[in-house]
Amino acid sequence: MLHLQKGSNTLIRVWASYDWANSVYFLVITSTIFPIYYGSLFADNLYIEIFGQSLKNTALISYTTAAAFAVVAILSPILSGIADYVGNKKSFMKFYTYVGALSCIGLYWFNLDNIYFGLICYFFASVGAWLSWVFYNSYLPDIAHPEQMDKASAMGYSLGYVGSVLLLVVNLSMVLNPSFYGIEGTASEASVKAMKYSFISVGIWWIAFSQIAFRFLPKNISKNPLTNKVIFNGYRELSAVWKTFSNHPILKSYIGAFFVFSMAVQTVMLIAAYFGEQEINWGSSSEKQIGLIVSITIIQLIAIVGANITAQCSKKFGNLPVLITLNFIWVSLCLYAFFVRSPMQFYIAAGFVGLSMGGIQSLARSTYSKFIPKTDDTTSFFSFYSTSQMTGIVIGMLLFGTIDQITGSMRNSVLFFLSFFLIGAFLLIRIHRRMTN
């Protein structure tokens, strides 16, 4: 096998290629086609009797998402501990890639008649996507030097945006012109079938393009045997990482700030398409389909620019000032979203979300990479990072779903999350002042 040196452009591109493979899940399943399909299932009634409760459809998907992230938050320390000790994080990355991709294919059979099976597939698709992401993130310090991390992180997100948009364009073509692809039925029936075929395309794309990273990323082989004690190494290592934070107060403060603003960013992004599907006054179902896909496409395309602009700004002004600015932009976006009702207003919001979304995600990751101490145990530090992110999403989705269920409006949930961006900005300002003083 070809051995690629750390810091080489080829190795960085190989690592970033997994973003190209994996990001189609986040765009097609999380953000566009699946939310539209899911909303179409509840066209006549937003509520469903399930688990002995009458739940609003958006609250149900919020709770299911929270459950998936709870599993990820619990398993991530265990699996990363095993991977770091045994040296097989690529094997775990492969396994959860296949779990996620095959579950996406299983979404083809999602309907109200077998709602439980559909939710299970949605659940495991999310688990697979995010657990594979844990091990992917942990490779960043292994493939890039500190001065390369911002650029490498931005390259990953940019490739992910481009690749996912390419597949989305194909899926959009299928949904809008199903007869061209030989999909039969009435216009409405054929469009729904095309959405289901889109789920299959995500699974195939994800599996196919992930082979590049699987082929060339370093294996980190270790001869340490797997024992019962190793299973809980992850939690012991997380505890050790937490103790390490005591010697690195800036890093400890940063992970706290990250927990708050990441919870808000990830939650808002996970429900954005459902918000657009339910809260915006679209003229017709076809206009809704086109409008939502166009909105998310705008987000993805502008996010490419946003991620690179943010990387350039961080070089000039520093990471923390840029992160603080991005948090205040998100405060404005949440306030604006509360009043958004027309498609044009939604498109404007989508543009600003795109500019700030890619930037805050890539910069948050690379900033953490710079703050962690020099160590060979990068997996445990990134496991702590990912566990914080996942735990935040669990709390965020539960809060969002509960407010939505009680008030009957997603607008109130979005407005509530404005407070988390304010807290995140305040915490980052404190860190910046401590560093400058």
Annotate each predicted stretch with a short phrase.
Residues 108-121, 338-350:
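Helix-loop junctions at membrane interfaces in 12-TM secondary transporters
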Residues 12, 109, 205-216, 360, ...:
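Multi-pass alpha-helical transporter architecture, strongest
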Residues 74-88, 305-319, 404:
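Helix-to-loop junctions at the C-terminal end of transmembrane segments
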Residues 55-58, 146-157, 289, 369, ...:
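Loop-to-transmembrane helix entry/capping segments in MFS-fold secondary transporters
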Residues 91-106, 321-336:
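Structural signature of the two symmetry-related core transmembrane helices
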Residues 54, 175-204, 402-421:
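A membrane-interface helix-boundary motif in multi-pass transporters
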Residues 2-13, 218-255:
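Juxtamembrane intracellular "pre-TM" segments in multi-pass secondary transporters
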Residues 29-57, 270-290:
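Short amphipathic helix-loop junctions that connect adjacent transmembrane helices
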